[in-house]
Amino acid sequence: MSGLNLKADIADRYNPFLEVLLEEHQNKMHSVYIVGSALTRDYDPKISDINSVIVLHEMDLKFLEMLAPLGRKFGKQGIAAPLFMTPAYIDNSRDVFPIEFLNIKLLHHTVFGQDIFRDLDIDRADLRHQCERELKVKLIGLRQGYVSAAGDRKILATGFADSFAGYMPLFKAIIVLLGHESPQNNPDILSTLTDITGIRTDAFNQVLALKNRQTKPTMEKLNLVFEDYYEIIEQLGEMINAFDK
């Protein structure tokens, strides 16, 4: 959605980068977007980067070579390396990355050019297939991550905290797949998922508190979180596996 209000501090941080892009290379640009947490209440300027998508008329590797040295300067200012795409790439990749494109469609702010994502069509069959695959991948990752932590509380806690953000795009996609409008903020995503599926997501709320440095759980508590995490993803996987079959 391009009608989202852009906070002044976000605009102030991103505009110098945008000016560099447009000053000499505007003719290469189809459109530029800010995406992700910078558009939500979850954004924390102390730890969050500003993510963006740059759509070029055609992929230009020389342009990327010119832009690369600027990464250090703007990276220190909290500007993450953008995703670069072309209209043709977007059109040809919707079936491969429906979750990613759905999340961009749901949460973007156009800062330059014509909004190519607003009316982007995401096929529900493609979305269901990727949701099912991603849930299975999450289960593999949970098993491997838990064992590789080797009983180290700090490693396990860090692993859970670092993994949290990767679940939110998937959960938003599941909410949309099940026919509902997805919220944009993490606590609302979790509560909506519970309301729709009946699957409790308390473990993810606990990890969100851990991620926000509000708790310091014991190893016993982390073991319970692991079990609950696994059960949630397993139940969601079974639900999506049976969806529309």
Model-derived features with residue positions:
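Helical scaffold of the NTase/Pol beta-like nucleotidyltransferase catalytic core
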Residues: 1-33
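Conserved NTP/Mg2+-binding pocket subregion across the NTase superfamily
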Residues: 3, 9, 65-158
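Structured loop/turn residues at beta-strand edges in well-structured enzyme cores
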Residues: 27, 48, 77
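Conserved nucleotidyltransferase catalytic core and NTase-mimicking acidic/glycine-rich helix/loop elements
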Residues: 14, 114, 121, 125-245
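Residue-level preference for long, well-ordered alpha-helices that form the structural scaffold
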Residues: 6-10, 63, 218, 225
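Catalytic metal-binding acidic patch
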Residues: 33-69, 81-87
